[in-house]
């Protein structure tokens, strides 16, 4: 069986969010049962020398969009520690000129042009390489055009005649919505796709709606999120469409790469440890206190937050409760970037409080050290399709404090239940979050209970093995391949 993954970002080459981790790790678990190729843009931030990314010979290709020819080139390397080919599509006008995966302040129309061009280039390069995929696995709105192309422009193309499509929703809030004329730029058959059973949504083109309608299976990244998006509260005006295709909707929990996130071998840590030696974890806490200029006190727990600084992640709750957090017997490390107002708030807190320190930006090595150093990991998301941060935190023995939504509900067993590995609150407001934090601080004073919970968290299995089997069964079901 041949599986083609298409995504805007793939770890470790390019990463802005959890999508990169999923596409960079799930194929590893599938490799023994399928032949896999991954396609992603060659962003300007990708280090070609570091990852030994080389240009494919005679790969220059010209494609026309909006009556303008555009030049593409193909580069390739292997996914680390695998035999999986990762193909990078280079275009100087749309991707290679930017140092970020998702540059800020782009013209929205231009953003659509970027991923239309990428999606069509994926189709054409797969043909040029003779990679006749049994299943194309598209991810989020950036590659939502692929199911539409399969249904329209390539509908009678013999090369794609037996190809099925899986579309994965990592975050329903970002759907790719623009005016009807974007279909002309895409050279897409408007008479076929622009209707209520295709991509038309409130007199606009909605790429995600089209992908949901035309894909053979639609995957949400956790069972709870799959149920939530069928409701008006979480459905982002797409719940009606999703209820209509509920027969092909699946909820499969994401995992993390246990080789990448491994406190026993992680070189970013001051001291390595595992579930049998998590007393050594304290050395990482001391290192983080030194790094951020906090006064170390073993009786004060460290609470970390590593997140995009946007409303979805519950940063407004931290803003609302900032005075209360300063008065707790705990220290805080906040890391992230995003909304300018939240970035400025974090900088102010770092400069004007005794127990809160922040890092505005993202540093993967520092993030791993903070995971290892922290006693608790705060994740008060308004909604969370799956969430990987709480899985990483538990892997490193940091107990998550989460709101019971989406993948957080599926992965965290809240205190005081048996085998609890974290703490939950149920209402999205600052006082409920504060009460959950206070509960965690109370447990911290009882080292027997705290260490039992830490052991339970570190022994929780959120590797890709179980989820990969569900994906593989789904691929086989729609392709009739074994």
Provide a role label for each language-model segment:
Residues 1-482:
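Catalytic cores of nucleotide-sugar-dependent glycosyltransferases that transfer UDP/GDP/TDP-activated
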């Amino acid at each position: 069986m041949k599986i083609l993954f298409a995504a805007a970002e793939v770890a470790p080459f390019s990463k802005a969010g959890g999508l990169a981790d999923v596409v960079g790790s799930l194929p590893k678990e599938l490799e023994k049962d399928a032949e896999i190729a991954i396609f992603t843009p060659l962003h300007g931030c990708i280090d070609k020398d570091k990852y030994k990314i080389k240009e494919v010979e005679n790969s220059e290709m010209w494609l026309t969009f909006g009556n303008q020819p555009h030049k593409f080139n193909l580069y390739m390397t292997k996914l680390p520690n695998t035999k999986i080919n990762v193909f990078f599509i280079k275009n100087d006008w749309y991707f290679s000129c930017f140092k970020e995966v998702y540059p800020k302040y782009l013209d929205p129309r231009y953003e659509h042009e970027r991923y239309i061009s990428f999606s069509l280039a994926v189709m054409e390069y797969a043909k040029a390489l003779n990679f006749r995929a049994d299943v194309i696995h598209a991810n989020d709105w950036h590659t939502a055009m692929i199911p539409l192309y399969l249904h329209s422009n390539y509908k009678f193309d013999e090369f794609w005649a037996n190809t099925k499509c899986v579309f994965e929703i990592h975050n329903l809030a970002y759907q790719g919505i623009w005016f009807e004329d974007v279909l002309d730029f895409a050279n897409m058959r408007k008479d076929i796709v622009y209707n209520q059973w295709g991509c038309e949504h409130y007199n606009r083109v909605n790429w995600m709606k089209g992908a949901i309608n035309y894909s053979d299976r639609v995957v949400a990244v956790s069972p709870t999120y799959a149920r939530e998006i069928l409701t008006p509260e979480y459905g982002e005006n797409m719940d009606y469409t999703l209820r209509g295709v509920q027969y092909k909707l699946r909820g499969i929990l994401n995992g993390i790469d246990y080789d990448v996130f491994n406190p026993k071998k992680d070189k970013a840590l001051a001291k390595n440890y595992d579930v049998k030696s998590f007393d050594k974890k304290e050395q990482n806490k001391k290192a983080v206190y030194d790094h951020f200029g906090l006064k170390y006190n073993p009786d004060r727990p460290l609470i970390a937050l590593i997140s995009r600084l946007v409303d979805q992640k519950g940063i407004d709750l931290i803003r609302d409760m900032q005075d209360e957090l300063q008065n707790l017997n705990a220290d805080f490390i906040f890391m992230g970037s995003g909304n300018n107002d939240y970035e400025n708030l974090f900088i102010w807190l770092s400069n004007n409080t005794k127990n809160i320190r922040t890092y505005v930006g993202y540093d993967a090595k520092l993030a791993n050290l903070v995971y290892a150093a922290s006693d608790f990991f705060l994740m008060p998301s308004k909604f969370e399709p799956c969430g990987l941060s709480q899985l990483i935190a538990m892997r490193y023995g940091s107990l998550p404090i989460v709101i019971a939504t989406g993948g957080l509900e599926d992965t965290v067993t809240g205190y005081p239940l048996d085998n609890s590995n974290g703490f939950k609150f149920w209402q999205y407001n600052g006082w409920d979050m504060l009460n959950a934090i206070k509960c965690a601080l109370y447990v911290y004073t009882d080292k027997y209970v705290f260490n039992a919970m830490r052991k339970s968290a570190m022994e929780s299995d959120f590797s890709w093995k179980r989820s990969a089997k569900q994906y593989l069964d789904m691929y086989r079901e729609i392709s009739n391949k074994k």
